[in-house]
């Protein structure tokens, strides 16, 4: 007989795990389904934000800022730093430690509030009386639970461009761009939104030559004009990003040697050659395989 809960939450990102904790605090028998696994294959809570989004990106931003400050920010104090080196492996290990500490915190809250953590891909499998049947699949096996109510908190995933295959080694979305094993000499970024600017800033501070291609003719078009204008100064003059607006992306050719990207700018055919390419053109709902 299937396990029965008052509430089942599909997704353990910021919306999902908080919903599950609150439901449990209100006395409801609660389960939370999460399919995320880290590169070692270990199941983890926290969703995109905690594992491959907000938290690790801020950890890398802090590390890269410290490195840049050591090189260029101490002159007014009479301090000159020479021979400074960035240990990328150690920086990435620190990032993973920050993430691990926070995921353990969520696990502790789940145990404290007696929330059942179901590991796998959750999908609706039809009605069960006035409630729902939910199927949890993992590694070819599946189990079914029932719930009086279901909270869908499956978040979003990176939008990919047609004809631009992402392997998260040479051509990357946020997942791959947070885990480069070394600083690329030349980094291309498609998209000058928050994600593209953050990731571009990280690797630029560490020494990469970063070129950002943005389809819109206006920088940060959704922001207030004064904010956009100041941000442009910060990212181009202070951070050193080469941002090219109104760039129409064409053919992208990737190999182990790098990427060749053809695009149109001001009516002229241009080509960008880089060692790695980050595709950051927004997010789409993560609703594949959610069921009826």
Label for each model-derived stretch:
Residues 18, 160-162, 167, 198, ...:
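Glycine/Thr-rich phosphate-binding loops of Rossmann-like dinucleotide-binding domains
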Residues 195-216, 233:
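Active-site substrate-recognition segment that forms the wall
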Residues 147-149, 153-159, 274-287:
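Glycine-/small-residue-rich beta->alpha transition segments that form the dinucleotide
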Residues 2-5, 21-28, 32-183, 211, ...:
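Glycine-rich flavin
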Residues 7-32, 196-205:
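N-terminal Rossmann-like FAD-binding beta1-loop-alpha1 element of flavoenzymes
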Residues 167-185, 276-292:
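FAD-site-proximal beta/loop scaffold in flavoenzymes
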Residues 11-16, 155, 191-196, 207, ...:
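Conserved phosphate-binding and hydrolysis motifs of nucleotide-dependent enzymes
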Residues 2-15, 183-193:
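Beta1/beta-strand and adjacent pyrophosphate-binding region of the FAD-binding site
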